[in-house]
Amino acid sequence: MKFTKTNDLRDAYLKFFESKDHLKLESFSLVPQNDKSLLLINAGMAPLKPYFTGLQEPPKKRITTCQKCVRTGDIDNVGITSRHGTFFEMLGNFSFGDYFKKEIIPWAWEFLTGVLELPKEKLYVTIYLDDDEAYEYWTTLTDVDKTHIFRLGKEDNFWEHGAGPCGPCTEIHFSRTDEVPTNSEKFVELSDEDKIIEVWNLVFTQFDGDGKGNYEKLASTNIDTGMGLERLAVVMQNKNSIFEIDTLENILKEVGNLANVKYGEDNKIDVSLRIITDHIRSITFMISDDIMPSNEGRGYVLRRLLRRAARHGKTLGIKDAFLCNLCDVVIRDCGSAYSDLEAKKDYIKKVIKIEEDKFRETLDSGMEILNNLISELKENNEKVLKGADGFKLYDTFGFPMELTKEILEDEDLSLDEDGFHKEMKEQRERARSARKTSNYMGTDVKTLDVISGEIETTFDGYENDSLIAEVKTLVNGEDFTNSIIEGNNAVVVTDVTPFYAEMGGQIGDTGTIYNDNFKGKVLDTKKNIGGKIIHFVEAISGELKVGDKVKLEVDNARRENIKRNHTATHLLDAALVKVLGSHVHQAGSYVSADRLRFDFSHFEGVKEEELLKVEQLVNEAIMSVTPVNTTEMDLQEAKNSGAVGIFDDKYAEKVRVVCAGEYSKELCGGTHIDNTGKIGLFKIISENGIAAGTRRIEAVTGIEAYKWVNEKAELLKHISGKLKCSEKEITIKLDQQSKEIKEKEKEITNLKSKFASMEINDIINSVKDVKGINVVTYALTDVDGEALRGLCEKVRDKVNNSLTLLTSSIDGKVVICAMADKEAVSKGAHCGKVIKEAATILGGGGGGRPDMAQAGGKLPEKISDALDSVYKIVETLVK
């Protein structure tokens, strides 16, 4: 056979269809674009759905791809069998209203028998029961043996997914047996035994089905084919499973080397080897597509795969984190086809390392608890772990439910999944209840949520900061009312408003509401569940009635500051992507008049030099004095234009796109300045982590940034005055003083040790004989732990057959140290047990070895009682 290596097979396929006038497209991201029905791309045609449905025009009517895919529906079988996997590459060629059966059938035969040189006598074809057209083309346009063609029913050879485009398919199979099927029943039997395996599926999309068995011919027919690259490699390399083909075998061998085991010698070991081999491929490709480990969605899938692989590595005896280096094999073998793997190599390795280290930290603790629970189950002859116990492992140690299930299954046990989900639901309810408020600014929230759906409230504040409106509804406390008077705190709903309601992280506007008979302050603006804009108003004077005309005026100075901060978050978002990478996505924001807060996905703390670069980029955009334009367009048009958005959110068909020149382009309904220069200055004041994989930046702009800089300048001036140096010399002066302080502290410590050593004779003279052991106890003051340990060593060396316990009170706390020589230990003395009891009396804890132990306490007034207890404890221990 001409081609056998996996990479060569991929190239041969794509080149073949390029020769048939197909446009070769690079693999799409594993993250579906504009398709909420999928968590991850799981088929070759999945990214091409818009072309098949007519929503988008394909770049060409003939396309060929090799699409990376991840499927986790069979994850529990991965490793258990040798044919299941989560990651695979799907070769495909597609026609959008161009060629059909007459062309693709002979092309498929040409590729398999001509290019790949597969023996024709080993190839079998299945067609749909009634597809005479396909049969005709197979028998007239190829030289396939007619006795190798079998007609099968709908479940085998008709592609249909609910209502919509569908059609028959023809599949090409390869025989790995000398048995020759003479009828369709025997063919199916051999297929079920994996003696004949499917290689290529050609789908003929020619009908529009209603999902009830009724079909109409489509005006335009399509071709959708799929051939798994790994399965093709199994055939071409004459292997028994995907784990034996070149690319996967390289990974598997590397894992075996790390664990010092061989594949094929032990079934349990083989399972772990296969799981790691498969999962590292999914992990590597998912991270390269900017998926981050998390507890939700596709991030959870990644975390689950990574933790499952890490646990099986530990099962194999691999002590240290290894997945971050194992991905090198994937990148080396697949890098020629997926160039972004090499480009993102360091990033991929770093994300894996951080996540694996984090999991290994908790794995030991969690496994200890789970092993204890397993032991209890077995002792009690029980088979099911309580859901509450499983949830505690998830909540405390980050054990995914699936991981706990898998470990239990290894022990022939199971998890009460209903109980687990019940605990999860109750925790979410508690969190939701904690977030709820029944009252806001004196108004019952439930009352606000039932404001009539007939009332229309329109926001008209992008261009206006004041306008005339009609009062439609008034709410005073829990009650709807027809009027409010001076002193009332109430909700006012008008037919139109210039006030922006809190949304998308931007706080609501404030201002005034008035007419000839009434004056009030608008303290806040929000939306209720029904989307009505509601003003929280403090009535200052007069009376306001339903139906009154009022003037609404926004506090424009405050709004301008909000606009500065909101536009700055857009510039910050773009700068973070540029500096940290395309994996950065907005995870939340808060935009007020005096500051901004921006949450984003990132796997580690942002380095100081990275923060400085981000800040510099934002200020460069500000100083460029770039116009900020807002445009309303169709959602799809906005996406196609490259506008950034949180596309998991629900958007209307018409959206606003805010564009700051070449610096930023985002979908946004908030208010913005019309020129970046109006931001004035941007200053980051903090950066920290708020959750695993999520960071937060807080910043100020405009006058607040000026104030912040001024405060720091005054502080530097004050510090330089105290240090009697220039501001430039502050760090030098502080380094000098820090060095001097450390030297003085060292001198003090040495002096304390000398003074303590002077008491050595007094300490030794406190010795008492307890059942043949010399027990020494003594209380000191202001001696640190290191010095106390040194004194214990001196006493031990001077007093034979001894156990010594010394305490020292420092700053209201107690340090304890105990030591025993070999002779005392041989008689039963145990420092760890002695010090544990003594520390308990002192309100602390600790422990250690028989010959040495340390502890701490917080009750210095109990030192005398603790020392007295030592004699009793030793007496119980000595043989």
UniProtKB/Swiss-Prot annotation:
InterPro entries: aa-tRNA-synth_II/BPL/LPL, Ala-tRNA-lgiase_IIc, Ala-tRNA-ligase_IIc_anticod-bd, Ala-tRNA-synth_IIc_core, Ala-tRNA-synth_IIc_N, Ala-tRNA_ligase, Ala_tRNA_ligase_euk/bac, DHHA1_dom
GO cellular component, one term: cytosol
Subcellular location: Cytoplasm
Xref: CDD domains: AlaRS_core (cd00673)
Catalytic activity: tRNA(Ala) + L-alanine + ATP = L-alanyl-tRNA(Ala) + AMP + diphosphate
SUPFAM superfamilies associated with the record: Class II aaRS and biotin synthetases, Putative anticodon-binding domain of alanyl-tRNA synthetase (AlaRS), ThrRS/AlaRS common domain, Translation proteins
Keywords: Aminoacyl-tRNA synthetase, ATP-binding, Cytoplasm, Ligase, Metal-binding, Nucleotide-binding, Protein biosynthesis, RNA-binding, tRNA-binding, Zinc
Keyword Acetylation annotated: no
The record's free-text note on cofactor binding: Binds 1 zinc ion per subunit.
GO molecular function, one term: transferase activity
EC number, UniProt record: 6.1.1.7
Binding site for Zn(2+): 566, 570, 668, 672
Entry domain remark: Consists of three domains; the N-terminal catalytic domain, the editing domain and the C-terminal C-Ala domain. The editing domain removes incorrectly charged amino acids, while the C-Ala domain, along with tRNA(Ala), serves as a bridge to cooperatively bring together the editing and aminoacylation centers thus stimulating deacylation of misacylated tRNAs.
Family: Belongs to the class-II aminoacyl-tRNA synthetase family.
Described function: Catalyzes the attachment of alanine to tRNA(Ala) in a two-step reaction: alanine is first activated by ATP to form Ala-AMP and then transferred to the acceptor end of tRNA(Ala). Also edits incorrectly charged Ser-tRNA(Ala) and Gly-tRNA(Ala) via its editing domain.
Protein name (Swiss-Prot/TrEMBL): Alanine--tRNA ligase
Source organism (scientific name): Clostridium botulinum (strain Alaska E43 / Type E3)
Gene giving rise to this polypeptide: alaS
